[in-house]
């Protein structure tokens, strides 16, 4: 009898402790309590941000990999009328999605992110929004892997001190770590999924919010796989930052890969997938699977093209999807649109526009 009473008391205490734990902010996601990486006292609301059901009734502009090229970025933003001549946000009711890979290869990654963070604040006043997605090169920097960093960037923005740059990205209190770690790797807007690398049947077993959270947790775990997780490695080729098998193979095995794509889209109740990461040799946005799959890494950065920028962007407006290609030249006499940029080089470009309709064929 005494033994039974003791059991009841222990059971009561266990339930009381569990219930008390469930009332804490950190219990919004039970995985966080199992994971020993995170100090629960330091959790903030950014761990619980939801990116799986964003509704937007205005125009959407999506930009692919920038790789340190502030000139291509500003050409796109000026051409799409999102910023004015003074580089302030002017677009009304527009959602801008940048699909990751701002850093590396080029020089101006730090300036670009500071500029985009500024635009995030300004856009709100115009009933607009800027969503920045984490790319694999943001992840590489957060993990202290600097093999793709342009030495000029360290010289110009980090006092030519690699240790200072390391602290800025890898230390949890570093300037860029604090901001980049919050970027979502995957976002769903209306019926469109945006992610940097891509999706596959394995990772798509998880929800968007789980993918975002667990990718972040692995980076915060010194980029090592997380305990208590069956998927294991979110920073591998199976994770959304790096998954490029579909993008690389869809030009050659379109029927097979599109079948896989539609299975994944059905899982997320989506119709379109927009990815970067896989550079398009044509320097134009790639479209596959009856215009449901868009590859928007056009290799735009002038740092990877001997000084020639190839800016492109995806425009979604009034249920119409268009790929916009900007043909950019430096001419004294410009028969097209002339754009003077507020960039370190202060270059004036002659810009010719080419648009391609990408709505699905019914």
Curated annotation (Swiss-Prot):
Keyword set, alphabetical order: Hydrolase, Manganese, Metal-binding, Protein phosphatase, Signal
GO CC field: endoplasmic reticulum; extrinsic component of membrane
Classification via Pfam families: Metallophos
Translocase is among the record's keywords: no
Residues at which Mn(2+) 2 binds: 101, 136, 196
Family classification: Belongs to the metallophosphoesterase superfamily. SLP family.
Designated name of the protein: Shewanella-like protein phosphatase 1
Organism name: Plasmodium berghei (strain Anka)
